[in-house]
Design a protein with these regions (language model features):
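Active-site and donor-binding regions of nucleotide-sugar-utilizing enzymes
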Residues: 10-178, 308, 312, 322-330
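A nucleotide-sugar donor-handling region in carbohydrate enzymes
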Residues: 143, 151, 156-247
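A donor-sugar binding/catalytic signature common to diverse glycosyltransferases
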Residues: 309-353
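Short acidic-hydrophobic, aromatic-tinged amphipathic segments that line or gate anion-handling sites
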Residues: 63-67, 299-305, 355-361
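Conserved donor-binding/catalytic core segment of Leloir-type glycosyltransferases
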Residues: 243-257
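Catalytic donor nucleotide-activated moiety binding site of glycosyltransferases and closely related
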Residues: 253, 274-304
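Short, charged/polar "capping" segments at the starts of alpha-helices
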Residues: 44-52, 128-129, 149-150, 258-260, ...
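Extreme N-terminal starter segment of soluble prokaryotic enzymes
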Residues: 4-9
Length: 362
C-alpha cells in the first residue's frame, strides 16, 4: 500500500461519479494547488482507458483502480446472508456479514485510506462502505446519482422492517447502512435536499448548478478531453454535417424492464419523434439493447461517457432531451427537458417494481 498524508481521495463507481469528482477538483484548483487522488472501482463498470486520460489531464495527483469484491464472490460472506426466519437471528448474522464483507476488500485496496484527511465516496452502499465501517475510517458520502433519492430511498428500501433498530445498530457500527447512516459517515452530500424522499440528519447540500457555474472555458475543454475517448467522432455524430435541418431530439435510454419490454418502450418514444426530428439516442452504459439494429434511422452514440459532458461541448445543442426516470437538471445543451416519469413507466411494467419509496411511510 502507498501512503498519502493530509489530502483527499474520491472513490467512484460510475462515469457520472468520476465526472462530478473532476468538476469538484477543477473548481478547487481555482483557489488551491493541492491535488486529490481518485480511485475507480471496476466492480460494476468498465472504465476503459479513463485512467490514462485522467493521468494525462493532470487534474488528480494519482489515479487508482480498485478491484472491489461483491459479497457473492465469497462463500463465507454469503453464508451470513441467508434468511434465518426471524429479525433477531438475521441481525445477529448481519453483524458478522458486515465485518466479513469489509474484510474481503482489504487485499484489494490500492492505497491507505486512513492516511487521507478527507475520503469522498459515491454510492457507499457498495462494499467499500463496509470496508470503511470495518476499518473505522471516517468519510463523506455523496449521492449515487443526481437527485437519486427522489425515486429510491436506498437506505430505507434496503432496510425494511425494524428500521429504528437497524439505524441504532448502524450508529454503533455493528451493522452498515449507507447514505449517511453509518457511524463513520461524516456527512451525506446531495444536490438538492428537497428532491429526496427522506434524509439523515448529517445531510449537506451542494448544488451541481453552482459548481457548473464556476467552470471556465478551459475547464469545459478539459472535461471533454477526459470523458470523450473518441472526441472527434462523437462530436461529428452529435452535430452532423448540416444536411439534416430538422430539430434535434436526444433520447436517454436506461436499463429498464426486460429486454423485449425495453425495446417496446423506447421504440414508442422514437416513433413519436422520428418523423419530424433528427433523433439521437444516448444509451445508458449498462443498456445492451442493440439500438443500431433495432432503430437504423436514428443516430446512436455508443461511446461510454456521462451525459453531463455533452454540456461541455462547444456548439452542441438539441431542441429536446427526453428521459424516462433519469433525473435531469441544468442540461445546458437542451432547450427543453422532457421527463416522462413513473406514470409513463407504469404502462410498461408492474408499478411495484419501480415505485420503491411510496410505501415506506405507510
Amino acid at each position: 500500500m502507498s501512503k498519502r498524508d493530509n489530502t483527499r481521495i474520491y472513490i467512484c463507481h460510475t462515469y457520472y461519479h468520476a465526472y462530478i469528482a473532476v468538476v469538484k477538483e477543477l473548481v478547487k484548483r481555482h483557489t488551491s494547488d493541492a491535488k486529490a487522488d481518485i480511485m475507480l472501482s471496476t466492480m460494476s463498470n468498465d472504465f476503459g482507458k479513463l485512467k490514462e486520460r485522467l493521468e494525462r489531464a493532470g487534474v488528480f495527483d494519482r489515479v487508482f483502480m480498485f478491484d472491489e469484491k461483491e459479497d457473492v464472490t465469497s462463500e463465507e460472506v454469503m453464508s451470513y446472508h441467508r434468511d434465518k426466519g426471524n429479525i433477531v437471528a438475521n441481525l445477529l448474522q448481519r453483524i458478522t456479514y458486515t465485518k466479513l464483507l469489509g474484510k474481503l476488500q482489504e487485499p484489494h485496496i490500492p492505497t491507505d485510506l486512513s492516511a487521507y484527511r478527507d475520503v469522498y465516496v459515491f454510492c457507499d452502499s457498495d462494499p467499500i462502505g463496509y470496508y470503511l465501517n470495518y476499518k473505522k475510517i471516517r468519510y463523506h458520502a455523496i449521492e449515487d446519482g443526481l437527485n437519486s433519492g427522489r425515486l429510491d430511498d436506498q437506505a430505507r428500501n434496503a432496510n425494511r422492517g425494524a428500521w429504528p433498530l437497524k439505524r441504532a445498530m448502524a450508529a454503533l457500527g455493528l451493522i452498515f447502512i449507507e447514505s449517511g447512516y453509518s457511524r463513520y459517515c461524516i456527512d451525506y452530500e446531495v444536490n438538492d435536499i428537497s428532491a429526496n424522499h427522506s434524509l439523515p440528519p448529517n445531510v449537506v447540500e451542494e448544488p451541481r448548478e453552482e459548481l457548473g457555474n464556476k467552470l471556465t472555458p478551459e475547464d469545459h475543454a478539459i472535461l471533454v478531453n477526459i470523458f470523450l475517448e473518441n472526441k472527434d467522432s462523437v462530436v461529428s455524430q452529435l452535430i452532423g454535417d448540416g444536411s439534416d435541418t430538422r430539430p434535434q431530439v436526444m433520447i436517454l435510454t436506461e436499463p429498464l424492464c426486460e429486454m423485449d419490454v425495453r425495446k417496446k418502450l423506447f421504440g414508442d418514444i422514437i416513433d413519436e419523434y422520428k418523423e419530424d426530428n433528427r433523433v439521437i439516442i444516448k444509451p445508458h452504459p449498462r443498456d445492451v439493447l442493440d439500438y443500431e439494429k433495432e432503430f437504423p434511422d436514428t443516430i446512436v452514440i455508443r461511446d461510454k461517457f456521462p451525459m453531463e459532458v455533452l454540456g461541455d461541448i462547444e456548439g452542441f445543442k438539441v431542441d429536446k432531451v427526453i428521459s424516462v426516470i433519469t433525473q435531469m437538471e441544468n442540461v445546458y445543451f437542451a432547450k427543453e427537458i422532457v421527463y416522462l416519469g413513473l406514470d409513463f413507466l407504469d404502462k410498461y411494467e408492474d408499478p411495484s417494481i419501480h415505485r420503491k419509496t411510496e410505501n415506506l411511510d405507510k
